[in-house]
């Protein structure tokens, strides 16, 4: 992923409230547009980098269950 894109996404949401971040995520998912996927990936990268090992395990379990449901 281009480093400029990563920085642009982070700069675009830096300082946003939890409500604004949630709106950004929900809007990106509901739009269904593939052009939103890199931005969601950057946000997930930030989450992952700041998550505890317990949080990571929970996310992986949730992901695994979600993929089984598809």
From Swiss-Prot:
Top-level lineage group: Bacteria
Single biological process term from Gene Ontology: asexual sporulation
Protein keywords: Sporulation
Induction: Expressed only in the forespore compartment of sporulating cells.
Keyword Protease recorded: no
Subcellular location: Spore core
Keyword Zinc in record: no
InterPro entries: SspI (IPR017525)
HAMAP family, A to Z: SspI
Sequence similarity: Belongs to the SspI family.
NCBIfam families cross-referenced by the UniProt entry: SASP_sspI
UniProt-recorded name of the protein: Small, acid-soluble spore protein I
Species of the source: Bacillus licheniformis (strain ATCC 14580 / DSM 13 / JCM 2505 / CCUG 7422 / NBRC 12200 / NCIMB 9375 / NCTC 10341 / NRRL NRS-1264 / Gibson 46)
Species lineage: Bacteria, Bacillati, Bacillota, Bacilli, Bacillales
